[in-house]
């Protein structure tokens, strides 16, 4: 932990080199997308996308699971999504699963989670797709994790304020899958119902 503390203590010196960029952030935010992904420490949205401060509104949960929409049971997840869409006017929502996901692995294997009851109960929200997930023994559990992403996309569609915007053509949903061992980002292509690598295009330089 100490290296992290030391870095945080010196971070102010780095912002001093870019005072205008950071001062602008005080004026408000207009993020390009809501990025929903797992809490896994190996998945870093700004690293994957090259996003600078202010460009991504993030929601991270164990296993990038979203709870069912329930107006009687407000959740942090629903509040974050609602704020992104209704207040910030975000027009793109990414759900990004990943390889080697502990949560999806536990679901696929049917692990005994008695010792972590909050995790056990949270994973009941996972709602796998009707076509099921495959416990094929692959340590990367890619098939299961990709199916899991699509299940969360379906769940998002059940959030009424999202459904309204989707119907009006004002919102786009993106299902992504990140391979943590290769750095490859795959995107779901509905016509083929498969995840494929993003075609290479010129990109801007990553933030320093
Ligand atoms: Zn995960």
Pin down the residues of each PLM region.
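Short beta-strand segments
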Residues: 36-38, 60, 94-98, 174-179
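Thiamine diphosphate
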Residues: 26-32, 40, 52
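Structural motif
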Residues: 32-34, 55-57, 91-94
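Divalent-metal-activated hydrolytic enzyme cores
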Residues: 1-31, 64-91, 102-208
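Catalytic core of membrane glycerolipid acyltransferases/transacylases, capturing the structured
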Residues: 41-62
């Amino acid at each position: 932990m100490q290296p992290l503390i030391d870095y945080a203590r010196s971070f102010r010196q780095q912002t001093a080199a870019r005072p205008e960029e950071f001062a602008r952030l005080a004026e408000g935010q207009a993020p390009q997308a809501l990025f929903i992904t797992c809490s896994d420490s190996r998945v870093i949205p700004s690293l994957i996308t090259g996003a600078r401060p202010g460009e991504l509104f993030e929601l991270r949960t164990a296993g990038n699971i979203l709870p069912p929409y329930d107006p009687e049971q407000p959740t942090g997840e629903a509040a974050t999504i609602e704020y992104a869409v209704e207040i910030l006017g975000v027009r793109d929502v990414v759900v990004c699963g990943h390889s080697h996901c502990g949560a999806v692995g536990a679901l696929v294997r049917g692990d005994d989670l008695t010792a972590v009851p909050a995790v056990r109960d949270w994973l009941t929200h996972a709602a796998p797709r009707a076509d099921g997930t495959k416990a094929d023994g692959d340590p990367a559990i890619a098939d299961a994790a990709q199916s899991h992403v699509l299940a969360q996309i379906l769940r998002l569609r059940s959030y009424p304020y999202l459904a309204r915007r989707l119907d009006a053509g004002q919102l786009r949903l993106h299902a992504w899958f990140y391979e943590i061992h290769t750095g490859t980002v795959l995107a779901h292509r509905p016509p083929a119902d498969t995840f494929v690598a993003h075609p290479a295009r010129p990109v801007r330089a990553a933030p320093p």
